[in-house]
């Protein structure tokens, strides 16, 4: 039962990361000033 909990937790983390990636892409497309520095770093991360 414990392993099942870890699997669910892992899936939730992956989904959250994917959602973050989508938000980052949208923000970068909008060229939000606050995100400009993060977007520069984000380009080097293969999503």
Curated annotation (Swiss-Prot):
Complexes and interactors: May form homooligomers. Probably interacts with the periplasmic domain of PhoQ.
Compartments in which it is found: Cell inner membrane
Name of the featured protein: PhoP/PhoQ regulator MgrB
NCBIfam families on file: PRK10299.1
Purpose of the protein: PhoP-regulated transcription is redox-sensitive, being activated when the periplasm becomes more reducing. MgrB acts between DsbA/DsbB and PhoP/PhoQ in this pathway. Represses PhoP/PhoQ signaling, possibly by binding to the periplasmic domain of PhoQ, altering its activity and that of downstream effector PhoP.
Keywords: Cell inner membrane, Cell membrane, Membrane, Transmembrane, Transmembrane helix
Membrane topology of this protein: Single-pass membrane protein
Transmembrane segments annotated in the record for this chain: 6-26
Species: Salmonella dublin (strain CT_02021853)
HAMAP family per the UniProt record, alphabetical: MgrB
Taxonomy of the source species: Bacteria, Pseudomonadati, Pseudomonadota, Gammaproteobacteria, Enterobacterales
